């Protein structure tokens, strides 16, 4: 490690006063067995960070004995993430090694903890150490830090890393004691420079048998070596392999700027996730929300920062969350004037449902970052706020237990994995580029597609996540988490947590829901959700396709045949019918029912109606997609042997009124088959109407709103529209496969 002390502080080291070193015959030989019970791992940590707990978890997996120095003490070793330092570690180790000064049979391995993972067993470690022929073996790296000028004093090596790294070393207790007892410097002086100068003394190096692990047989420092490291999967264990030297290191050290890469490796090594066992620690340290007792208080912060499809459905889902509403405070920031009517419609229900509510509207003129800072700080300042649940309006939580599940995962920060339907776009990044933007990790696709299931340490999350309230109060007390930089608010948020060493976890153990696509949401339409069949097909179907359509397609006896080869089935929801009619009336340019029609290629309509074509309102492509997706499969199930591409040139809404055009004379349609959907209710919106098929003398007099009539067109099914006697009747017609 390094810290902020000036580099040249100990250019002059005191002379070493060492007892005679072991002779060559006393040094360990490759065949000498070493008892793992004589091995002690010593590390340093001032706080039980998530990195430290990860280190302990890996040590426990292999049954290492670990002694931690410095817990609860103040760190005085400098800002080792940015400059030199770390001398405090040597001072602590010096004091500790006094206990083992005479233990010739004991082997000590010293490693950092926050950025270290153990990947092999004590037996393997000791075997490799003995094979090294050393009394003290340091890890090695490609950089001569902190003084590059010392590089020429290092012995040349044929293959491997040349320079010492102080983040890990292993040796006999007596030898380590002889080394560290020479420390007489400041806590923020540099530990690596101290060990480097001792190693560069040729006489001392030979006398004490000091060596470097040039080929990463034991220690793998990641800085400068990321291209050398790959994951090696066994059935119930994962470790790393150094492909440059064909070694299997035991200590993985994310030194320097490689913390995120270590987090990635730590998702697997040693048993984070294995092909056979799956997630190896997902069930550790969980909490259970006991029944009969009040669950933790939650601050639910909802953000509507952009025009978002299906917002009324999102607001209604808040009422359905499987969590006691009297334990939830709701904060809602709406940045869009367009959505004010939607929120106004739902706000009375939300007020009655949750224990407390706060609405911040567009009139406050808060930026997205400022709004998020405001919400998070309200939780931070409230000692009763146990969890902060941030939820963006484009996150569709179909799993109503999401909040409960995330709380029980018992992490400081955790997000549910969400992705766009059928896409790889998700609410997390598996890696970062050098400029801290998106980069795809090797396992990204497997995580999004849930081919690997577990809890993952990732560098970026957004749109939905849960944070412990005490984490905000104790570890992230500053208010400007989102708006404190020029970057995107979510990127600033994630960097704030990463810089504090707080892990950003992602769970894909459950199906939580999905994300909406919002970039092409056009609010110029009266009902813009209607246009979302391409971008958000699942949500579009839920809102606009009849709830019984799927049952009808599966042959559950819903489809009726009121006339020969005339099939009747549920297709559109009431909302779809209403919004389609509203769009047409909003457009308002009805044809007038004349034979002359400039919209047609020939300019003449033989059987004219008062209508508006889908093309006129910009809905042609969307309607054709509906035909392909929903009408085509139904047609092929009703007419076996017929395959349709669901092509249609004529797609239009017809309006019938007694004083305008009440009926339609007998005619054949210019189609292979025709789709005719009732868009409003007989008896409520109009009287009369219906359809008569003359060849069969068969009348359908009571069309059902949202139900479609499907019948052959140009040859057999000669038909007429019966008179509408009162009100206004609307139908949607498509001439399919003309």
Curated annotation (Swiss-Prot):
GO molecular function per UniProt: iron ion binding; L-ascorbic acid binding; metal ion binding; procollagen galactosyltransferase activity; procollagen glucosyltransferase activity; procollagen-lysine 5-dioxygenase activity; small molecule binding
Accessory region: annotated span: 295-520
Signal peptide extent: 1-24
Positions annotated to bind Fe cation: 667, 669, 719
UniProt GO BP: basement membrane assembly; collagen fibril organization; collagen metabolic process; endothelial cell morphogenesis; epidermis morphogenesis; hydroxylysine biosynthetic process; in utero embryonic development; lung morphogenesis
PANTHER family in the record: MULTIFUNCTIONAL PROCOLLAGEN LYSINE HYDROXYLASE AND GLYCOSYLTRANSFERASE LH3, PROCOLLAGEN-LYSINE,2-OXOGLUTARATE 5-DIOXYGENASE/GLYCOSYLTRANSFERASE 25 FAMILY MEMBER
Tissue-level expression: Ubiquitous. Detected in heart, placenta and pancreas and at lower levels in lung, liver and skeletal muscle.
Cofactor(s) the protein requires to work: Fe(2+); L-ascorbate; Mn(2+)
Protein's recorded name: Multifunctional procollagen lysine hydroxylase and glycosyltransferase LH3
Binding site for 2-oxoglutarate: 599, 656, 676, 729
Gene: PLOD3
Pfam families on file: 2OG-FeII_Oxy, GT_PLOD
Primary location group: endoplasmic reticulum
Region feature (Important for dimerization): 672-715
């Amino acid at each position: 490690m390094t810290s902020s002390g000036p580099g040249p502080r100990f250019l002059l080291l005191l002379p070493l006063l060492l007892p005679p070193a072991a002779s060559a015959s006393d040094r360990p030989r490759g065949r000498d067995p070493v008892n793992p019970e004589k091995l002690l791992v010593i590390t340093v940590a001032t706080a039980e960070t998530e990195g430290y707990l990860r280190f302990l978890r890996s040590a426990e997996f292999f049954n290492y004995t670990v002694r931690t120095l410095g817990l609860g003490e103040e760190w005085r070793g400098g800002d080792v993430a940015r400059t030199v330092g770390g001398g405090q570690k040597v001072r602590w180790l010096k004091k500790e090694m006094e206990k083992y000064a005479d233990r010739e049979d004991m082997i000590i391995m010293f490693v950092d903890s926050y950025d270290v993972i153990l990947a092999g067993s004590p037996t393997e470690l000791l075997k490799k150490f003995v094979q090294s022929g050393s009394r003290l073996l340091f890890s090695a790296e490609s950089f001569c830090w902190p003084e590059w000028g010392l590089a020429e004093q290092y012995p040349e090596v044929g293959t491997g890393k040349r320079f010492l790294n102080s983040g890990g070393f292993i040796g006999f207790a007596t030898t380590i004691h002889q080394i560290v007892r020479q420390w007489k410097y400041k806590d923020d002086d540099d530990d690596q420079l101290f060990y480097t100068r001792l190693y560069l003394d040729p006489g001392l190096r030979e006398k004490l048998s000091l060596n470097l692990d040039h080929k990463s047989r034991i220690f793998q420092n990641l800085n400068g070596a990321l291209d050398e490291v790959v994951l090696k999967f066994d059935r119930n264990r994962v470790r790393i392999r150094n492909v440059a030297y064909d070694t299997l290191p035991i200590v993985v050290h994310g030194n320097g700027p490689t913390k995120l890469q270590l987090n990635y490796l730590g998702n697997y090594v040693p048993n984070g996730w294995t092909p056979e066992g799956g997630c190896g620690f997902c069930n550790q340290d969980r909490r259970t929300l006991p029944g009969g007792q009040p669950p933790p208080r939650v601050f639910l912060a909802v953000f509507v920062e952009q025009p978002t499809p299906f917002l009324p459905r999102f607001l209604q889902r808040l009422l359905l969350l499987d969590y006691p509403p009297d334990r939830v405070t709701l904060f809602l920031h709406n940045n869009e004037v367009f959505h004010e009517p939607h929120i106004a419609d739902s706000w009375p229900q939300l007020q009655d449902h949750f224990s407390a509510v706060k609405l911040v509207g567009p009139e406050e003129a808060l930026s997205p970052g400022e709004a998020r800072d405001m919400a998070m700080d309200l939780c931070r300042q409230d000692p009763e706020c146990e969890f902060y649940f941030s939820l963006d309006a484009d996150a569709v939580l179909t799993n109503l237990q999401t909040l409960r599940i995330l709380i029980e995962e018992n992490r400081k920060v955790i997000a549910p994995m969400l992705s766009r339907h059928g896409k790889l776009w998700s609410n997390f990044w598996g890696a970062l580029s050098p400029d801290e933007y998106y980069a795809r990790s090797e396992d990204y696709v497997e995580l999004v597609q849930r081919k690997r299931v577990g809890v993952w340490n990732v560098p970026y999350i957004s749109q939905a996540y849960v944070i412990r309230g005490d984490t905000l109060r104790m570890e992230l007390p500053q208010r400007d988490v989102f708006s404190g930089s020029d970057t995107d608010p979510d990127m600033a948020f994630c960097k704030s947590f990463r810089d504090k060493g707080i892990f950003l976890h992602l769970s894909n153990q459950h199906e939580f829901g999905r994300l909406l696509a919002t970039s092409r949401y056009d609010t110029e339409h009266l009902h813009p959700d209607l246009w979302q069949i391409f971008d958000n097909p699942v949500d579009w179907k839920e809102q606009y396709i009849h709830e019984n359509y799927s049952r009808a397609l599966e042959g559950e006896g819903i489809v009726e045949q009121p006339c020969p080869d005339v099939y009747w089935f549920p297709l559109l929801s009431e909302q779809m019918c209403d919004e389609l009619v509203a769009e047409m009336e909003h457009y308002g340019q009805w044809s007038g029912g004349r034979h002359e029609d400039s919209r047609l290629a020939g300019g003449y309509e033989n059987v004219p109606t008062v209508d508006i074509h889908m093309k006129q309102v910009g809905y042609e492509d969307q309607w054709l997609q509906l035909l392909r997706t929903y009408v085509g499969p139904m047609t092929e199930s009703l007419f076996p042997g017929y395959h349709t591409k669901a092509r249609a040139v004529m797609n239009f809404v017809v309006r019938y009124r007694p004083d305008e055009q009440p009926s339609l004379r007998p005619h054949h349609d210019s189609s292979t088959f025709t789709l005719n959907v009732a868009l409003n209710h007989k008896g409520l919106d109009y009287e009369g109407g219906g359809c008569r098929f003359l060849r069969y003398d068969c009348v359908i007099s009571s069309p059902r709103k949202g139900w479609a009539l499907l019948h052959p067109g140009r040859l057999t099914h000669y038909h007429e529209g019966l008179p509408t006697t009162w009100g206004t009747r609307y139908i949607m017609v498509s001439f399919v496969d003309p």
